Amino acid sequence: MDSITNGESFYVYDWRVVSTEKDTNYFDRSGNRKKWTEITLMLRAYCVDANGATVCLRMGQVKTKLYVEFPENYDLNPRRWSAIRTILKDAIYCKNDKCDSNIQRVSLQPLYGAKQVRTYVAIEFTSEVGKRAFINKISGKCDQRTKRTSAKFPDNVTGDQLRFHWMNVPTELQVLVNAKLPFAGWIETGRLYSPKDRKTRCDREYSVDIKQVRTSTSMACVTPPLKTFAWDIEAKINDMSSPGTHEDDEVYMISISVSDNTDHLILIAPDGCGEAMKRSMGAGDELTVHVCPNEVSLLLEFNKVCRSIGAVARMGWNVNRFDCVVLMARANRLNCSTTLLDLGLALDVPGCVSTTAGRTFGRFSPNDAIYFDTHGVLCLDVMEMFKSTYTKLPKYSLQYVSQKFLGTTKDPVTLKDLNELHSRLMLDDDHTNALRAVVSKYCVVDSRLTLQLCQKCAHMTSLTEMARITNTPITMVHYQKQQRRMFHLMFSECARKGVAMQDDFGRDRRLTMLDEDSTDGSSNVDNKRQLNYSGAYVKDPEPGLYNMVGSLDVNSMYPTLMIAYNLCYSTVIDDDAHSDYTDENFEIVEWEDHVGCEHDPNIKEREKLKSIFEDLAKVEKRKFIGVQPITKYFKPTSTTRKPVDDVEEHSECNGFTDDNYNDSPVSSIKLSSVDLQRAAIRLKVLKSRMSGGSKLCAKQRVRILKTRRGLLPDLVEYFLDARRKVRAEMKNVSDPLARDILDKSQLAYKVTANSVYGSTGAVNGKLPCQNVAKVTTALGRKTILQSIDIAQRDRSVSTIYSDTDSMYVQLGDEAGDDPWKFVRELAAHITSKLRKPMVIEAEDDIHAKVLFLGKKCYIGRKLFRDGSVSRELDWHGVITVRRDHSQYVKDVYRKAVHRVFADCTMEQFKHTIFEQALTLMQRRVSYERLTKTSEVRNVGDCCTITLCKKTMSWMLGDYKVPQHSHHDILYNTKRDALKTYYVSKLPAPARLSVSLVDRGRPAIEGGRIEFLNIRISNPDDLPIEEISYFKEHGGIVDRLYYIKQIINPLTKVSEAVWKRSDTVIGAVTPILNYDKVVRQLDTMFN
């Protein structure tokens, strides 16, 4: 190799370990010539330089490591070590790994439990195959054709007693952590060499020693010139349940929009119509048209164009669930899948299909979300980015999102237009050419909007910053979310501090300190979910209007609790767990957990409220009465008496009807009619909060090691400090691009710090530790209760509402003329009583008036420092900020609440509701304002059901359904009848999604379906319909349904303000009576 440069700076975005094979010959001890396949691992880094050119850095051979843990009391002394190393060496598969230098004793601290440093065996392998073969041979695992026992070690220790660490840690993660290099970010190299042969399609390719590569700090705020493109397809699909698999399916158009403002259009059309179509579209030289005679040529041309662009990322809208699925299905049918997948930069490594969960093997179903995993080119779904970032959008169609974020949208092209063009693909008349130009423009605009949305919201910057901070590949950050990021992050920290990170929990989960009960069903006959700890503290507000309300918040409560109390895998243990440290080294934390038991405050309050209605029932001679609210709109759909939940005992009274409120209660119950109504509603709320039959009644006690700092506190403290530094640096940066990078960086630090707590509580996660999760939650409850008590005791400030880490306090005359200063002083006083570094912060907003309706449900109006109030209201947890209500219902609710904040009377409130309801009945509300959206999950093929072992329920995709009594017979003979049965058991939105597929409509984007509620005559008919289909085929909107939708939410407002639950029903009663008369007349004359 020739040296060609002393080094450069590159932005790395994709690391890959390539497994290479080489056949070598050798002679055994008997002199026989034998052939050996040598497998090695080679590391590559795909980068771009400062000009945006793609670069591949080949860093030579790397090794993957494994740690072996022997039983706790097994000493690896010199007497045993020689025999142990010989046994381990014999179990190694690869010849090059059979050397003493590859097998070493090392001292590491165990991750779980308060234990001191122990001795482990570290073994390096030249291939992943060799590492897996070694593990199987030592532990005795094998396939069914091989009979193999575990290895035997001195003093009766067998291989199945050993535990392996780093067995699931990717090789590139091990290498990059050891070399202190980022998964994404700027790096600086030493001397670069020109390789003898090229392995990639990159613009430049070098060989470099990984020891001469380091992270670049001088270019941290320099925006990387990443070239990207977005793509979209148009296809004729006959069966949307399995797109692309039908013999008559066909992909006939693909568009590509590149970040350098150029576009490509690949389509099936008559030869020579490209230029004419560009003129019809009004496109210039920025658009290149590729005309293909058939579908195979189109797929091959798509592959050729993608490779010629030289982009580092390809993205689309909903490509994982539609475009990639269709392309792969068509390529498989046309026998060109290998060529299609050759979309990456590597010449010697073909692309592969991977699910978004990371599976690259086995058969993929049409319902699997997949992407094309290729070296050097990231495959991203922009819709998934928006779903994870903007979780409250009512729908995720490209048309809606682009209108909301870009202020523009695509031209409306109907399914009829698309099907007509497909039927006339090879025609060259004026009508076909005009239609082809319209559809082509529609397809190109789809790609342009997708690319613009990604650039507008800086999603690539968000992904790269999160990848850099958490040491996780960009693709993994995009698809696999929190647990995988925490696994990579914890591995990096463990490797840096000499901790043996456990990553295999399949054989003995007791080492994770979970202390779980038996899960085989023998100890849990009734299939109830066993609780291990209770949740955060919530103080419910008393519904009503409050003046002058301030808010306090525990800043990063769970992360700072981990720092304050040294909470970590290696410091928190059960009270009776063994430890290498003595008792004086521990801090004891004790508390009680009560969920669903007789000590649960919710249970106590529920029993008290039930006794009121039971006493009333006795006066009425044990007449069957209900506990539901007073109006008929709160009545249950069935009068069948059911227990409140599985925990309560049988009661003679579990209902309360309207008529009883007008009777005279017994003398011992001095409650008004309104109080009884509120008690009934409160009883219903408490019922909804019951634990679903699960019970927890326990005194908890854990020990926390004080003498050694844990990994999690250090990690969380680093992230919080780094975020403060980045936020401070943002104030001094004027460049918008650099400021955008810093903003995404500080957000990544915040999200990661808050994710640490959540990852410990995930029982089936990558690194579970419920001892940490439960003590953190308990200390959080203690902290917020202590803060409420301090505010009341020291400053006479009462707390109206508290939830997890926040407090809403009532400000009285003591706040004076400057309530902001008073709240800040209150926060500082509470902070002085808490353990450092915990801080209570005063929110900047003081509300002049707040309407509290319930838990996480309140509306406020801000107070400005000049004494004026905001014209806008802050909405929290009410229907105006939820996705499952129509715009009309939200508008009615918003107008009515605004009248409440304008100090209207109850009659004025009723008049506002009546006017809005009358507007609807007079058909002065557009269909678009009546449209609702709802989430739709996977329904599979609507015939195949599986048994969920956790709940022992039959599942149709993601929905629970009853099994048909003749399922097996119908599945093989009459699948249509079976499909009709199971679809009828689905919720209405899911049934509508199936109907759309049967009609040949495109797949639902973003998993949310848009529909109208319509009037039906047959109860078995579907009461909802997709809006475009409704406009084409007609129907009657069920306007009464929308009026009923406003009754419950506004009744809560009326109860909170005027203590009346009949206000709203009184306002809409004339409308309801009018509708009833109209329907009777329709029945009489029709």
Curated annotation (Swiss-Prot):
GO terms for molecular function: DNA binding; DNA-directed DNA polymerase activity; nucleotide binding. Keywords: DNA replication, DNA-binding, DNA-directed DNA polymerase, Nucleotidyltransferase, Transferase, Viral DNA replication. InterPro entries: DNA-dir_DNA_pol_B, DNA-dir_DNA_pol_B_CS, DNA-dir_DNA_pol_B_exonuc, DNA-dir_DNA_pol_B_multi_dom, DNA/RNA_pol_sf, DNA_pol_B_thumb, DNA_pol_palm_dom_sf, DNA_pol_type-B. It catalyses: DNA(n) + a 2'-deoxyribonucleoside 5'-triphosphate = DNA(n+1) + diphosphate. Residues 638-657 are annotated as: Disordered. One of its GO terms (biological process) is DNA-templated DNA replication. It comes from the Viruses. It holds the Pfam family DNA_pol_B_exo1. Replicates the viral genome. Host DNA polymerases cannot substitute for the viral enzyme in this process. Belongs to the DNA polymerase type-B family. PANTHER family: DNA POLYMERASE CATALYTIC SUBUNIT, DNA POLYMERASE DELTA CATALYTIC SUBUNIT. This is DNA polymerase. It comes from Heliothis virescens ascovirus 3e (HvAV-3e). The lineage of its organism: Viruses, Varidnaviria, Bamfordvirae, Nucleocytoviricota, Megaviricetes.
